[in-house]
Amino acid sequence: MPTITSYFGFLLVALTITSALFIGLSKIRLI
């Protein structure tokens, strides 16, 4: 179980970082 939990946590972090980068690029393009 710990392996699945850690994998899910890593996936969530990766998704958050990707979303942050995408939003940052969108804001830079808007400006």
Swiss-Prot record:
GO CC, alphabetical: chloroplast thylakoid membrane; cytochrome b6f complex
Record bears the keyword Thylakoid: yes
Keywords: Chloroplast, Electron transport, Membrane, Photosynthesis, Plastid, Thylakoid, Transmembrane, Transmembrane helix, Transport
Membrane topology: Single-pass membrane protein
Gene Ontology annotations of biological process type: photosynthesis
Bilayer-crossing regions: 4-24
A Pfam family assignment: PetL
Molecular function as annotated in GO: electron transporter, transferring electrons within cytochrome b6/f complex of photosystem II activity
Superkingdom to which the source organism belongs: Eukaryota
Subcellular location: Plastid, Chloroplast thylakoid membrane
Main subcellular localisation: plastid
Family per record: Belongs to the PetL family.
Function of the molecule: Component of the cytochrome b6-f complex, which mediates electron transfer between photosystem II (PSII) and photosystem I (PSI), cyclic electron flow around PSI, and state transitions. PetL is important for photoautotrophic growth as well as for electron transfer efficiency and stability of the cytochrome b6-f complex.
Subunit structure: The 4 large subunits of the cytochrome b6-f complex are cytochrome b6, subunit IV (17 kDa polypeptide, PetD), cytochrome f and the Rieske protein, while the 4 small subunits are PetG, PetL, PetM and PetN. The complex functions as a dimer.
Name assigned to this protein: Cytochrome b6-f complex subunit 6
Source organism per UniProt: Panax ginseng (Korean ginseng)
Lineage: Eukaryota, Viridiplantae, Streptophyta, Embryophyta, Tracheophyta
Gene name of this polypeptide: petL
